[in-house]
């Protein structure tokens, strides 16, 4: 998201395709996801960021660089970056995330808890003396939190989220129709059919 232009610059999955032992990143995001299950033995499909933490530092840096070089025309080194992280994440994990973003070329990096970032993105005034329940469904983690007076009052996370839903869709289609679909296809179906409905009542 570019705050100056008020628009989303990159909206893609944190997936990378790497080559050989060097782990050279050759494809990222949707392009990499589409290659899942179709790569040669010399190529690997990796998730360098999982459950809100860094699982492969070098690949995470390579992925971020490719995203930013493609979309920001090499100006990333001149900007300050804000990165959302799960509530309750440890100091070691925080430092790893900061180091990845700095290594990718950012001038400065600030971490913000995911529930706060989600609330701000939804237009909620987080500084009000009111409690707002925020549900953040990521790829590997679903986080539920109460936000009030500019902070997270309480939060709880479970390691089941978007990826699990994708896998459930894949298994359902295979069981019902005996057809195997790609993870990217399952994700598209999830996004199209699983959007929240404003004004829905029970």
Kindly label every feature range from the protein language model.
Residues 1-137, 145-202:
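Nucleotide/phosphate-binding catalytic cleft detector across ATP-hydrolyzing
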Residues 140:
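Conserved Rossmann-like nucleotide-cofactor binding loop
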């Amino acid at each position: 998201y570019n705050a100056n232009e008020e628009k989303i610059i990159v909206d893609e999955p944190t997936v990378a395709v790497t080559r050989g032992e060097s782990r050279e990143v050759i494809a990222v995001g949707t392009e990499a996801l589409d290659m899942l299950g179709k790569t040669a033995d010399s190529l690997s499909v990796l998730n360098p960021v999982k459950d809100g933490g860094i699982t492969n530092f070098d690949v995470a840096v390579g992925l971020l660089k490719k995203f930013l070089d493609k979309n920001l025309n090499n100006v990333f080194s001149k900007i300050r970056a804000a990165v959302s992280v799960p509530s309750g994440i440890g100091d070691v994990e925080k430092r790893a995330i900061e180091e990845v973003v700095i290594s990718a070329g950012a001038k400065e990096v600030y971490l913000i808890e995911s529930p706060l970032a989600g609330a701000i993105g939804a237009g909620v005034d987080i500084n009000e003396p009111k409690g707002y329940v925020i549900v953040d469904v990521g790829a590997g983690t679903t986080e539920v939190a109460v936000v009030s007076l500019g902070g997270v009052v309480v939060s709880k996370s479970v390691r089941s989220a978007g990826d699990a839903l994708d896998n459930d869709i894949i298994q359902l289609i295979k069981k019902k129709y005996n057809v195997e679909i790609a993870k990217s296809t399952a994700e598209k179906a999830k996004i199209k059919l699983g959007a929240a409905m404003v004004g829905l009542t029970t």
